Regions:
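Short, surface-exposed loop or secondary-structure junction motifs
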Residues: 107-262
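Short, conserved catalytic-motif segment at the N-terminal edge
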Residues: 19-69, 89-91, 154, 216-218
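Ser/Thr/Pro/Gly-rich low-complexity linker/stalk segments immediately outside membranes or between
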Residues: 7-21
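Residue-level preference for non-acidic, small/hydrophobic
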Residues: 26, 40, 46, 74-77, ...
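Short active-site loop at a secondary-structure junction
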Residues: 32-37, 58-114, 158-170, 226-229
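Hydrophobic membrane-insertion alpha-helices, especially the h-region
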Residues: 1-4
Length: 262
């Protein structure tokens, strides 16, 4: 009961945020929180800048914080999928059984369905490591590896010809496993190499819990859900990442093109 009350209060408070001004939203979300550190970046007229805010939305001394960027990780995974397509390693209209060892005689979604969250998959599926993770206060997805993901894909029954949008962390975990199979490398290694050597983002990588803020999610190097939300970065790299899309580079431009109507 207490948990439900806590969630209800939290949801009620969050509903207020969209109607607030930028300044009011900052003050509201940092009210009375002495540990609050929110970094806001702006790109205007080709110039990027940022400011850091603390308790009660007050601007504080400039510092570069390492944040968990959460599901922005998915956009990086999507870029890696697009790169794999350009290299001829996969096709977006291929179904998963072309890249994963799965039971015959079943219907599997296409790569493009996973990218657009129209695969029919749930946000996630229960796996046994989640029990221990709950009691140890860990990241829910800690210890769920690629083998478990492939096994789950083989068990899920998808009987419709098409599915409507349903946000799926599981779907992006599957994409990570597909990338591992087509490249023969772990998603962590692929992502870290892509971020550093192809994108030049020196402070963006799969989380190793080494940032300055603490309380980062714990991950194993072979966790399948890394590709759904494990990357950490700072505001300078994130502004640079945003500029890649604004500058109309070929890879980023193609990733913004419409691929499916949902």
């Amino acid at each position: 009961i207490a948990f439900r009350i806590y969630v209800s209060i939290g949801m009620a408070r969050m509903k207020k945020v969209p109607s607030l001004s930028f300044k009011d939203a900052l003050e509201y979300t940092t009210k009375g929180n002495k540990e609050a550190l929110i970094t806001v970046g702006i790109i205007k007229d080709g110039k990027a800048e940022y400011r850091v805010y603390g308790e009660n939305g007050k601007e504080v001394e400039d510092r570069l914080c390492t944040y968990e960027i959460g599901s922005i990780t998915k956009t990086i995974t999507a870029l890696m999928v697009k790169r794999a397509e350009k290299e001829g390693k996969l096709e977006l209209d291929d179904t998963l059984d072309k890249y994963l060892s799965l039971p015959d005689g079943k219907k599997y979604p296409k790569i493009i369905d996973l990218l657009t969250h129209t695969s029919g998959y749930k946000p996630y599926y229960f796996e046994s490591p989640m029990i221990e993770n709950f009691f140890k206060g860990r990241n829910d997805f800690y210890g769920i590896n690629g083998e478990m993901i492939v096994d789950r894909v083989g068990k899920v029954n998808l009987d419709k010809e098409s599915y409507s949008f349903n946000y799926s962390n599981f779907g992006f975990a599957v994409l990570g496993v597909v990338l591992e199979n087509v490249y023969g490398e772990s998603w962590k290694k692929l992502a870290d190499d892509f971020l550093l050597n192809e994108m030049g983002l020196k402070n963006t990588h799969v989380s190793d819990e080494s940032g300055d803020l603490g309380n980062y999610w714990d991950w194993r190097d072979d966790d399948a859900y890394l590709s759904a939300g494990s990357v950490t970065s700072n505001i300078c790299d994130m502004l640079k990442y945003a500029e890649f899309y604004l500058k109309n580079d070929e890879l980023y431009r193609e990733c913004q093109e419409s691929v499916k109507t949902i």
